[in-house]
Design a protein with these regions (language model features):
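Acidic, metal-coordinating catalytic segment for phosphate/diphosphate chemistry
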Residues: 1-18, 24
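Short strand-connecting beta-turns/loops that link adjacent beta-strands
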Residues: 24-27, 36-38
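Short, acidic/hydrophobic/Gly-rich beta-strand patch recurrent on exposed beta strands
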Residues: 32-34
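A short, flexible beta-alpha/helix-coil linker loop
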Residues: 38-40, 120
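A short gly/proline-enriched turn/hairpin at secondary-structure junctions
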Residues: 42-45
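Unchanged
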Residues: 48-71, 75-135, 162-171
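Intrinsically disordered, low-complexity charged/polar segments
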Residues: 147-171
Length: 171
C-alpha cells in the first residue's frame, strides 16, 4: 500500500446536512422528526450526496423528512461527533417553511411535529442537537421572523453609475 492509498490519507468523514425549519406565525414552530429505524426524535437532516451542493442537500433533506417546502435563509453551524467509528460532520441551515405540507414524508420518518422552541429542545433525543438548538434556537426564530430581503442587483460591468432620483440630467 502506498502512502497515497493508505487509510490515513482517505477522508472517511460522513458529511450530513440539515435544517432548523421554522414555521412563522404568532407562535413560531420548529420541526422535529421521528425516525422509523430507532424511533429517535431528531432535527431533519441526512447524508449529503456525492457532488451535491450542501445548501441543495440540506433543502432536499428537510423537504423529504418534513413534507414542507422551505426557503434556506442562512448557515447556522456544525455538529461533529463519531458515528460507527467514523467522524460525522452535520451542517445546519435556518429554513422558513410554508404553512402547509406540499409533499409526502419519506418512509424513513414516522412522525413530524412542529413544536415551540422549548418543546422541540425537550423532544430531541440527541444530546448534541439539544445543546445546538438551545444555543442557536432563539436566534433562528428571530431571524426566521424577519421579512425576506431583496437581493441587490449589481450593474453590468462597464455600465454607467446609477443616477440618484434627485440628480438632474444636463443636456
Amino acid at each position: 500500500m502506498t502512502p497515497e492509498t493508505s487509510d490515513s490519507f482517505v477522508d472517511r468523514t460522513i458529511h450530513a446536512v440539515g435544517g432548523i425549519a421554522v414555521r412563522k406565525g404568532a407562535r413560531p414552530r420548529v420541526a422535529v422528526v421521528q425516525r422509523s429505524k430507532d424511533k429517535l426524535w431528531v432535527l431533519p437532516r441526512g447524508r449529503l450526496r456525492r457532488d451535491e451542493h450542501p445548501v441543495r442537500g440540506a433543502r432536499r433533506e428537510v423537504v423529504e423528512e418534513t413534507g414542507f417546502r422551505v426557503e434556506v435563509c442562512e448557515f447556522l453551524g456544525v455538529i461533529t461527533y463519531q458515528a460507527r467509528s467514523r467522524p460525522k460532520v452535520v451542517r445546519f441551515w435556518l429554513m422558513r417553511a410554508e404553512a402547509e405540507p406540499s409533499y409526502r414524508v419519506m418512509k424513513d420518518i414516522v412522525a413530524v411535529e412542529w413544536l415551540s422552541l422549548a418543546a422541540a429542545i425537550e423532544r430531541l433525543s440527541n444530546p448534541l442537537e439539544k445543546v445546538f438548538l438551545t444555543n442557536i434556537g432563539r436566534h433562528a426564530i428571530l431571524r426566521a421572523k424577519r421579512p425576506k430581503r431583496r437581493k441587490a442587483i449589481m450593474p453590468a460591468e462597464g455600465a454607467p453609475p446609477r443616477r440618484r432620483s434627485h440628480q438632474r440630467m444636463h443636456s
